[in-house]
Amino acid sequence: FMRPDVLISYLFPHVEMEWFIQGYAIFEILLGGGLLYYWLHRKGFSDFTSFACGFFYLSANCFFQAHRQIMFVNYLPFLLLAFLCLDRIFEHQEQDVYHIRPHIGLILSLFFCILHSFYFFPSCFLACILYISHLLPEHLKNVPARMQKKRKCKIWWNYIVDVSFAVSMNLFLLLPTGLSILGNKKDTGDSTSLLKILGVNPTLDSILYSPYGCGLTLFCLYALFLCIREKKTRKLAIAVFVLLFFDIFYWILNATLYVRPKCLIPFLPLILYLAAQALEGLRQKKIRHSLPLALLCAIPVIVQLIFLLHNQQIRHLVTADLVLLLVCASLGVFLEEKEITIPVSCWWINLGGLVLLLAIPSMLYLTKGQEEHYATIADESRDYFSREDLEACC
């Protein structure tokens, strides 16, 4: 009730609330895509790579929730702002001096993450930890060896201070919400079995296709595997893959309520950052294609086709996604072995590459949206209170 769209709506009592909620949701999706492009471009990625990953963001199936369960995705622009603030913190610190002090930009970014969706803040908090861990080694290279341990401790303490400020500023929301949850425990059915908690997710719907996960396509999983091979991105890529694959992390990040991959949506920006690393490396010939890794990506797709996906249109698109990846990986391996170089500066080659990368994600996004059965104004099945109850109270 303290979100910006809700507060602004109080100033316009004659405008229906649906316009504010829908307009703000669309604005946040577009803002997130723009911020992701800006973040990647600022980190030195090419226009091609930044645009492609920005489009991956906009076409991620998790944004299906922007009209249904808005708290699943409405914090993402502020998480991207937090990553931008972390970049600035590491860029502008003097190499011989580091003072522990609050970073206003990071505090405000995390504050709005909590304000929009406190349930997903533990995942946002962990995503920032992974990003800091990724940035630290490069930062410490410019710090004298005798000061590196002290500098590392100061950076982590500074992050804890910033998070503490953000949480404290949200206590007006967190305290009553926490007391309400404790005072009104909801029966969620049978408790989650230990076998399920300690299991794995062979479908990888935490990253692939599902609107209750990140909802990305197969190239992003392939890029994740390629980044595991590279020393610079290996630790971050392994950490992200472990979170995506092992059910116990779903359970922990869902506050031990259930084992569902929706808690991993906050890692979408990090996955796209790794996708940008892989795509840029492939275009610059710094990373080589791998047909075995492409074949490894086929396993979760086949499992999903057998057990999860029943819509024929989606099955065809997912199959096309797999075939396209295998063809591109095979062609890439062939060109590398023959030492044939494709000029990436040609506009028509870049255009063709964008079409190959973005066609399947956009079609999957539109097809997934067509599965929704939208509630009509006359449908009162979701109303907790009937119209008569509301009239009696008012």
Where are these regions (language model features)?
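Short periplasmic/luminal acceptor-recognition loop of GT-C membrane glycosyltransferases, typified by
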Residues: 390-394
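Membrane-interface coil-to-helix junctions
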Residues: 1-33, 55-77, 181-186, 194-210
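Periplasmic/ER-lumenal interhelical loops and adjacent helix-loop junctions
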Residues: 1-4, 154-265, 307-317, 383
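Membrane-embedded helix bundles of polyisoprenyl
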Residues: 29-43, 47-93, 98-137, 158-178, ...
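Alpha-helical transmembrane segments of polytopic membrane proteins
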Residues: 22-28, 72-75, 123-124, 206-215, ...
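Membrane-interfacial, low-structure loops and terminal tails that flank and connect transmembrane helices
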Residues: 94-98, 138-155, 340-343
